[in-house]
Structure formats: structure tokens, C-alpha cells
Amino acid sequence: MSEPLIVGIRHHSPACARLVKSLIESQRPRYVLIEGPADFNDRVDELFLAHQLPVAIYSYCQYQDGAAPGRGAWTPFAEFSPEWQALQAARRIQAQTYFIDLPCWAQSEEEDDSPDTQEESQTLLLRATRMDNSDTLWDHLFEDESQQTALPSALAHYFAQLRGDSPGDALNRQREAFMARWITWAMQQNNGDVLVVCGGWHAPAPVSYSHLTLPT
């Protein structure tokens, strides 16, 4: 595999969970990189304890100005979460597994008034398909086990339509640059294939694989 296999998913989608599990088991990559808080990597083994699902990672940071509210973020896992199935399948094949998303404490505090192109694209899709909401549309398009063989290409097309040529807002650009550095590092090891599991909105984003190193 000369390039990473980037699997864009919808969080908590059973269809995407099945797809991720199947791809990891069939492709047997050396590295499985998952959208999740990178500062939890040293403790990832805790997720393999005898938990009763659902479970979640909660990340929190308090700003130096004690009067200002802190920032928190949840990373939830259920049996039907693609990220959970990626963790389990990667462990079974003994792949090196890392979370690659920017920790909440490192995210920019700057306001961004970029237009929400994702919502605009979603509205156009709903209008074209005459569906009531995005959940109904998703179920209609993807949550059918008989569609599994065509699922990868269908997902790629769907998320490309949602993203279009939008660069994303400042936070998404920051997160995607961070994820790209992890992908670059894994590719530069030159000792096995790389499979990436991330939200579909991020999957079509242009990624440069040169002059980047492992985030610290």
C-alpha cells in the first residue's frame, strides 16, 4: 500500500463499524490510526479492561485564568462505534494503534466566522432526496447490510459531496493538520500499511505527507 487507507466514517454508525472491522481484518495493516485524543495514547490499554459498554474518555483543561470556564470533550465508545471496533480489531491483529486527534487543551481559542458549509451541503442533499433529516437520509443510504460491498465507495462519494472544496473552519484545519502529521509519521516508518479511521468530514481533506514529524 503506497498510500494510507483513509476510512471516513460516521460516529456510532453500525454500518461503518462493520466496515472498519472487516477492512482491518482483511487488510491487516501495521498501523491503525484512529480519530481520538492523542494525549490518551499512553493509557489506551485501559480501554481493554473489563468495561461494560458504553464507555467514554473525558478530556478537560482549565485555562490559566481561573475565572474563565475550562474546556471539555467526550470521546464515547459503544459496541457499534467504528472507533471501538477499530481498537478491538487492531488489537487482535497486533497492529500498532494510536489516537491521532488534537487534544482539547491544544485547540485554538480563536473565534472563527467561517460559513458552515457542511450544514449547507446537508440541506441541499435533504432537499434533493426529500428526506426529513440527516439521520433518516443516512439510514436510507447506508444502514443496510446488503449494501456492504458498495459501502466504501458510497461513503467516499457522500463525504466528498458534504465537504466539497471547503477548507473547513480554523479548528478543523488545526485538527486535520495534526492528524496529517501522525499519518505522515506512520507512512515514513516504511514497515507496513497504514489504515486511518476518522470522521468522514475529515477524510476528503487534502493532506501533505512531506516534511512532517510525529507530534509531541
What are these regions (language model features)?
Residues 9, 30-34, 183, 193-200:
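Beta-strand elements within well-structured catalytic alpha/beta cores of enzymes
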Residues 150-181:
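Glycine-rich phosphate-binding "P-loop"
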Residues 210-216:
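Conserved small/polar residues in nucleotide/adenosyl-binding loops
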Residues 1-161:
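Structured, acidic catalytic/metal-binding patches in enzyme active sites
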Residues 1, 181-191:
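A short acidic-Thr-Gly-centered motif at the start of a beta-strand
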Residues 12-16, 78-82, 175-179, 187-188, ...:
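Short, glycine/acidic-rich beta->alpha junctions
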